[in-house]
Design a protein with these regions (language model features):
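Nucleotide-activated sugar donor-binding and catalytic core shared by glycosyltransferases
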Residues: 1-234
Length: 234
């Protein structure tokens, strides 16, 4: 899908209620600014390192499926055209509706890895409001750098390690996150470095389940031994 789309993709992953409206306002503002620049024929766009609207695609994947319709309505209230994943017969590049849309809405289940693989950078849902964030290791494993907000307490250690390794960047809020993402999309060298850092971070953090089981094995063996003794004495 990524090669067929042939445009950078900015993803808002596992977005939450209270975050989407601000995201759409930022995307709408970027689109309006780009149209204004084109209308007055200025060179401001060429002087900016950020990718302007019309040269990237915005993908949003809400955390809760029951909110797909509400999220689409929020986007449309900002004058943004929406194309839903469920309406694509194949990939987005084969859908005229998708390629003309301002927002792609990931309204499917079990395809998060596909969405991350399609995207060049992801905003971490749940981190721009006091909701604790989401697990960002899946994004890293797909080679997708992350921009996150201040609220990552549910995954504090992973977020700190990702930030320290260059796989993620932390910003104050959604306006800063969108700008940081667009700047990354406009800087090929920085993007290559971020992708490499993401893959390396994911590789270092694979096998967490195996590590946990190894750590618990002595305890589990002790429990099994006690059960055998209790059964023998019964």
């Amino acid at each position: 899908w990524r090669q067929a789309v042939a445009q950078p993709v900015l993803m808002f992953a596992s977005s939450r209620d209270g975050e989407e409206d601000e995201f759409f306002k930022e995307i709408s503002a970027v689109a309006k600014a780009a149209r204004a620049q084109a209308a007055i024929n200025t060179v401001a766009e060429s002087q900016s390192e950020a990718v302007p609207a019309g040269r990237f695609k915005a993908l949003i994947v809400p955390r809760h499926p029951q909110r797909f319709g509400d999220v689409q309505a929020l986007a449309e209230q900002q004058g943004l055209r929406v194309s839903r994943r469920s309406a694509w017969a194949a990939g987005p590049a084969e859908s005229m509706d998708a390629m003309q849309a301002d927002i792609w809405l990931g309204d499917s289940l079990g395809e998060m890895a596909l969405y991350y693989g399609l995207s060049d950078v992801a905003l971490l849902g749940g981190s721009f409001a006091p909701l604790g964030g989401q697990n960002l290791i899946e994004a890293a494993a797909c080679g997708c750098p992350v921009v996150m907000g201040l609220h990552t307490y549910n995954f504090a250690e992973a977020a700190e390690l990702a930030e320290a390794s260059g796989a993620a960047r932390r910003v104050a809020g959604l306006p800063q996150a969108v700008q940081a993402a667009l700047l990354l999309l406009g800087d090929t060298q920085a993007q290559v470095s971020a992708v490499s850092a993401s893959l390396a971070f994911a590789a270092r953090n694979r096998g967490a389940t195996a590590h946990t089981l190894n750590a618990l094995r002595p305890f589990l063996q002790g429990v099994a031994a006690k059960s055998q003794v209790a059964a023998a004495l019964a």
